[in-house]
Curated annotation (Swiss-Prot):
GO terms for molecular function: chromatin DNA binding; metal ion binding; N(6)-L-threonylcarbamoyladenine synthase activity; nucleotidase activity. It comes from Debaryomyces hansenii (strain ATCC 36239 / CBS 767 / BCRC 21394 / JCM 1990 / NBRC 0083 / IGC 2968). Substrate binds at Y154, V155, S156, G157, G158, D186, G201, E205, N302. GO terms for biological process: positive regulation of transcription by RNA polymerase II; telomere maintenance via recombination; tRNA threonylcarbamoyladenosine modification. It is an enzyme of class 2 (transferase). It holds the Pfam family TsaD. It catalyses: L-threonylcarbamoyladenylate + adenosine(37) in tRNA = N(6)-L-threonylcarbamoyladenosine(37) in tRNA + AMP + H(+). Binds 1 divalent metal cation per subunit. The lineage of its organism: Eukaryota, Fungi, Dikarya, Ascomycota, Saccharomycotina. This is tRNA N6-adenosine threonylcarbamoyltransferase.
Amino acid sequence: MTVDLDQYAKPGKDYYLALGLEGSANKLGVGVIKHNLGQLSLDNRAEILSNVRDTYVTPPGEGFLPRDTARHHRNWAVRIIKKALIEAKVKGSDLDCICFTQGPGMGAPLQSVVIAARTLSQLWDLPLVGVNHCVGHIEMGREITGADNPVVLYVSGGNTQVIAYSRQRYRIFGETLDIAIGNCLDRFARTLRIPNEPAPGYNIEQMAKKGKHLVPLPYTVKGMDLSMSGILAHVDSLAKDLFAENKNKKLIDDETGEQITSEDLCFSLQETLFSMLVEITERAMAHVQSNQVLIVGGVGSNERLQQMMELMVNDRKNGSIFATDERFCIDNGIMIAHAGLLGYRMGQTNELWNTVCTQRFRTDEVFVKWRDD
């Protein structure tokens, strides 16, 4: 069944324009997207007019606090919005709607973005569209890669989920029971006191490429779910012993007798976590009888994760893997603009009173009205 995406089209206009605002964590993103009339397809793709982002970066060994992150977003919002509009070569009066991240995420940064969205809505007399952050990642990934109906591995600083579409919902088949994978990697980066720029997870990835020895770490998969807090606690204790030069037989490689390094710990942590993700993703693929995997979220840009997932997919008949680069994996405004515009085209808008952001907003709470396949 084909969904009519143009039942709310404005007379005499053959395209839609939306501005998206993202700020659920330490990245403030603004994007402008264009949809032509008709179904989106390989012959009628969404057009990215601008995708601007600024990141709040803290010193090595420190995380980002909600109040400081919110202050960054407030300080940069006007400049980033202006830059996005200039790059897109559009004015506020050209837009059809203002889309914003309604959740999930950090409360104070989300509020800063919502206030900016409300201000623009009233300034330009445009409707507001609240967007689920997770659905934004999924829809942007589908649009960029052309993936049809994949199993989605959503891995970021605040979320770890295995998702598949069914009956106008993105259903969660497996997820973390405690911390997200991005949070796990970021916290270990703080333990090692490595730089947060360009991103702690990226710096962990680069160190892991130099690792040679695989240190045994807890492997915690429980059915379709996984747990990472125990793994983090274990590898943290090893790192602290390494820095303190404490004698610990686990810091000596059994085969070579060589000293375990920080690079080895990064390598071991990545290999263990990614193996767990591959396992539950493959199980979801078997359950829904899909041969496609789409990786989204900030951790999705990790080359080793993509490589391990590709090895698994290649063992399946006609398997294929889809992923995007850091422009779209890492939090951005264009994904919010795209998902929001899909909702707007189906008549889904938010009244001002219904724009309250929420830190907890499940992926499967969203009614995916623009799909009926």
